[in-house]
């Protein structure tokens, strides 16, 4: 047992670790039968800080995931978009290397390269970010730009993005300062008017201005409990210099701006520029330049802080069919699992899958529209199935997708009686 008193005085207390008396230190903290002084507490903090500094990065020495490894992980869940995957894989790999490089105290400072993902709705921008989050061991958070407003107005401050990152890191400031932030719907904060002096744009240009220093690197004062700041509140200080920002948006209408620029450059009798209807949206977006983003409504300073631009293609019929069946979390597999819980098999013919993909293309909703189409096709069946007996299998073919009949129900009777689609 630790001695609580010295030999010279029964009232004098001593640190159980360094042996200094209460008169030699500023503070002596008492525990069950032990004491620790403020100097030993500070020493322990220094030891822990040094040991964890290298562990703040997800992988240890030599274990940084390669771009190929990151891309292979994305391939398991996201179909197509090879170029965007390469851009993201390299950016995240370099982010890991920057963290390792900084931890070693090298004299060369490596700057970060924030990323802008541009692509049609339903092309996989958000899914890429969500899939990336599963792989990463650094803190990762997603934010919605549509909820942000300029400081002093109703809505969320941009500092709330850093608060979400802190929450993802269990309020470990050191880890949060090395995290990754994905801001979705970034196109919704474009400038609302061509003339910036007409009125105060608190949810457009005002938010862009507020994000500038955050993305470049600043010390943000974050309220631990969230909400608006007030003078009596304590703040956490978070340095955003090493936080990687990835922004994504559909940028509806940007393809027209790009098309106008390309048509203006093509002159002469031999020049040919495909009409907008002849080009897919993704193909047009591939030729996006910073000047197009400026015309769209992003301010020059904001575009300058997103040096890497990755464009996503709109998904064609083959890609949508593959999305339905290939990924680990494919929609067809999900619905087959739901039906399997009822003891019923669910099958789709090849022409049914093609018809579903074509319907999604017609709706111009990309991969996001596939679930709503499947839900509509199977809603009545899922409603009736728990109350029915003897159903062995449900089959969906092209006629079902096109609305000419209901899904075919195969029963377990000897004659394999069919209902639903055969009723005519």
Curated annotation (Swiss-Prot):
InterPro entries: AAA+_ATPase, ATP-dep_Clp_protease_ClpX, ATPase_AAA_core, Clp_ATPase_C, Clp_protease_ATP-bd_su_ClpX, ClpX_bact, P-loop_NTPase, Znf_CppX_C4. Component of the ClpX-ClpP complex. Forms a hexameric ring that, in the presence of ATP, binds to fourteen ClpP subunits assembled into a disk-like structure with a central cavity, resembling the structure of eukaryotic proteasomes. It comes from Rhizorhabdus wittichii (strain DSM 6014 / CCUG 31198 / JCM 15750 / NBRC 105917 / EY 4224 / RW1) (Sphingomonas wittichii). The keyword Transit peptide does not apply. GO terms for molecular function: ATP binding; ATP hydrolysis activity; ATP-dependent protein folding chaperone; protein dimerization activity; unfolded protein binding; zinc ion binding. One of its GO terms (cellular component) is HslUV protease complex. Belongs to the ClpX chaperone family. Pfam families: AAA_2, ClpB_D2-small, zf-C4_ClpX. Transmembrane segments: none annotated. ATP-dependent specificity component of the Clp protease. It directs the protease to specific substrates. Can perform chaperone functions in the absence of ClpP. SUPFAM superfamilies: Glucocorticoid receptor-like (DNA-binding domain), P-loop containing nucleoside triphosphate hydrolases. This is ATP-dependent Clp protease ATP-binding subunit ClpX. It comes from the Bacteria. GO terms for biological process: cell division; proteolysis involved in protein catabolic process. Zn(2+) binds at residues 15, 18, 37, 40. ATP binds at residues 120-127.
């Amino acid at each position: 047992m630790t001695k609580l008193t010295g030999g010279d005085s029964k009232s004098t207390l001593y640190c159980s670790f360094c042996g200094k008396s209460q008169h030699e230190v500023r503070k002596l903290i008492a525990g069950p039968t032990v004491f620790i002084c403020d100097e030993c507490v500070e020493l322990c903090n220094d030891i822990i800080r040094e040991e964890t500094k290298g562990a703040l990065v997800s992988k240890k020495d030599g274990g940084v995931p390669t771009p190929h490894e990151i891309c292979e992980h994305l391939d398991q869940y996201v179909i197509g978009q090879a170029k965007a995957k390469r851009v993201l894989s390299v950016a995240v790999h370099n982010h890991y290397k920057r963290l390792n490089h900084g931890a070693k105290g090298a004299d060369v400072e490596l700057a970060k390269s924030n990323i802008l993902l541009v692509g049609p709705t339903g092309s996989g921008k958000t899914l890429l970010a969500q899939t990336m989050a599963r792989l990463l061991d650094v803190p990762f958070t997603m934010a919605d730009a549509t909820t942000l407003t300029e400081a002093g107005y109703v809505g969320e401050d941009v500092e709330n993005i850093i608060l979400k990152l802190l929450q993802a890191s269990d309020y470990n400031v050191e880890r949060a300062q090395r995290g990754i932030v994905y801001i979705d719907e970034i196109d919704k904060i474009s400038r609302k008017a061509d003339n910036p002096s007409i009125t105060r744009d608190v949810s457009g240009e005002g938010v862009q201005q507020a994000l500038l220093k955050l993305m470049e690197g600043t010390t943000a004062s974050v309220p631990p409990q969230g909400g608006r700041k007030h003078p009596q509140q304590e703040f956490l200080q978070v340095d955003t210099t090493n936080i990687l920002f990835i922004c994504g948006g559909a940028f509806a209408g940007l393809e027209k701006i790009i098309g106008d620029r390309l048509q203006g450059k093509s002159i002469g009798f031999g020049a040919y520029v495909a009409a907008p209807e002849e080009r897919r949206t993704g193909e047009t977006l591939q030729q996006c330049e910073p000047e197009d983003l400026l015309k769209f409504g992003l301010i020059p300073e904001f575009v300058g802080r997103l040096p890497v631009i990755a464009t996503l293609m709109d998904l064609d019929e083959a890609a949508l069919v593959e999305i339905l069946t290939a990924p680990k979390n494919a929609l067809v597999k999900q619905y087959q699992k739901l039906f399997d819980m009822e003891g019923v098999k669910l099958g789709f013919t090849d022409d049914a899958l093609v018809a579903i993909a074509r319907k999604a293309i017609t709706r111009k909703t990309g991969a996001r529209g596939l679930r709503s189409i499947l839900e509509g096709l199977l809603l009545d069946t899922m409603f009736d199935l728990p109350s029915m007996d003897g159903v062995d299998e449900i089959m969906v073919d092209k006629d079902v997708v096109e609305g000419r009949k209901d899904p075919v129900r195969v029963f377990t009777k000897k004659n394999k009686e069919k209902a639903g689609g055969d009723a005519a």
